[in-house]
Design a protein with these regions (language model features):
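Long, low-complexity, intrinsically disordered segments
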Residues: 444-457
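Short Cys/His-rich zinc-binding micro-motifs
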Residues: 431-443
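Phosphate/dinucleotide-binding and metal-coordinating scaffold of catalytic cores
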Residues: 1-312, 316-430, 455-457
């Protein structure tokens, strides 16, 4: 078990500097008990310094984490989530068997440092034992878009516990630090940029990633910041969604990233609401007014497409020169409204299964705007997303599946929002509601063949 590491950060000014030392204490079974982090004196004197996350203020001396959060969220955000951990554990299990040794008890820090440095999420980097290189070094090149069918097949075999050594090598080489439970990898685009390839899961009941592409395009039309993305059909009813990594700039430089889960310092099984999230984002934002309004627009979108997988890890911020800004939206998926599903409440005492867009309007003050401005935004988002069925068809979704998903879009919340359009002047310039920039390689939007993908990040 690894018990300590030196931590580095790529600063917005382009320098990579030592930031501090991290040590962890774990039980015999590998369960993390506590951790301790201490900033270096040089970092605390650096004019470009910033607190890595709310749990780690810029102070001298050790900062201890224990109890329900035994390691600071910024470190967790740079490591693997459920999908990545499953891959790394499978690789360790296979290595232990091949070497005839007991299975190692891996701590959170072990998982963090096992991630390949090249594809690690955010701007943090690690070294161990005073070594000169960052861990973990990549053994092979990051896969490219031509490897997508092979990645899909390997992920499917892994889900069925039939993966080979070659499968595990490919999937771990493709990166394990992206969050979430769904299969996903890092790939390199033809122009050399890193991108996320979200893969179909073996138990998908509909074309999940085509619907995510649909929702991203609707978000763009509604004026929400989205990453550039393309949809790559694999079979008639499944596809891979490839989107640019927004924690890298156009030159490949790293950009600091924190999840909403880290920002709100959410405890296990605790409930964080959108009013909690917008408050903490505004506290740390370079432009709190703009980010608060953007958050309101995203919540309106969430309610109008019934995106229920909107937990705090599916929100994030990126480091700027003097503070943080909301990242482009990600992991937005419609869900059939045929049964109630718990999701992020609008306010601390709000309903988790029956979120009401009328209540969102009542909460407009928490997002830094008056009710009239909030009504305008809701009406704009409703108009921009009203053509959801046509956009879904553009992405190759079959008519029967469009009908199946209609309850996600044609809801009581949409009826309420649609009534607002009769009294509000709509800004039709948002995101180009008559344009379809995001496309699939084989199914470009009919009127705009050859257009570039959606806006970059």
């Amino acid at each position: 078990m690894t018990s300590e590491a030196d931590v580095f950060v790529d600063l917005p000014d382009g320098r990579t500097v030592p930031v501090g030392h991290l040590s962890v204490r774990a039980s015999e079974a590998g369960m993390l008990v506590s951790s301790q982090f201490q900033y270096t004196a040089d970092y605390l004197r650096d004019p470009a310094r910033y607190s890595l996350c709310p749990e780690l203020p810029l102070v001298q001396g050790p900062i201890t984490a224990t109890g329900h959060r035994p390691i600071a969220g910024c470190f967790s955000d740079s490591g693997p989530d459920r999908w990545g951990r499953n891959l790394l554990f499978a690789a360790e299990r296979r290595a232990a068997k091949a070497q005839g040794r007991p299975l190692a008890h891996m701590t959170d820090l072990d998982f963090i440092i096992m991630v390949h440095d090249e594809t690690r999420q955010g701007a943090l980097r690690y070294s161990i034992d005073g070594g000169p290189e960052f861990v973990s070094p990549a053994r092979d090149q990051v896969p490219s878009l031509v490897d997508l069918p092979e990645l899909v097949a390997a992920a499917r075999r892994h889900a069925q516990h039939r993966e080979t050594d070659t499968d595990l090598d490919l999937l771990t080489r493709a990166g394990t630090s992206m969050g979430g439970a769904r299969p996903k990898t890092t790939v390199r685009t033809p122009d050399g940029r890193l991108a996320i390839a979200k893969l179909p899961a073996a138990d998908d009941q509909w074309n999940v990633l085509a619907w995510e592409a649909t929702t991203l395009e609707l978000a763009r039309r509604a004026g929400v910041a989205v990453p550039a993305f393309t949809l790559h059909p694999i079979t008639p009813d499944s596809a891979v969604l490839v989107s640019d990594r927004f924690d890298r700039d156009a030159n490949g430089a790293r950009i600091g990233y924190l999840s909403g889960h880290t920002l709100v310092e959410k405890i296990p099984d605790g409930i964080a609401s959108y009013t909690d999230l917008v408050e903490v984002v505004a506290d740390h934002s370079e432009d709190p007014d703009a980010d608060s309004r953007e958050m309101f627009r995203r919540v309106a979108l969430t309610l109008l497409v019934n995106n229920v997988d909107d937990h705090m890890k599916n929100h994030g911020v990126l480091r700027g020169s003097t503070g943080w800004r909301l990242s482009p939206v990600f992991d937005v998926n419609p869900f059939p409204a045929r049964w109630p599903v718990d999701s992020t409440p609008l306010s601390h005492d709000g309903d988790t299964a029956g979120r009401d867009i009328g209540q969102l309007l009542d909460l407009s003050g928490h997002f830094g705007m008056d009710r009239a401005s909030a009504v305008t935004i809701v009406a704009e988002v409703e108009r921009a997303t009203a053509s959801w069925a046509d956009v879904a068809a553009d992405f190759g979704i079959e008519p029967g599946e469009v009908e199946f998903m209609s309850s996600a879009f044609e809801s009581e919340n949409r009826s309420i929002a649609r009534n607002l359009t009769t009294t509000v002047r709509i800004d039709t310039s948002l995101g180009g509601a008559d344009r379809c920039q995001a496309r699939t390689p084989t199914r470009p939007c009919p009127a705009h063949q050859g257009m570039p993908t959606g806006p970059g990040t």
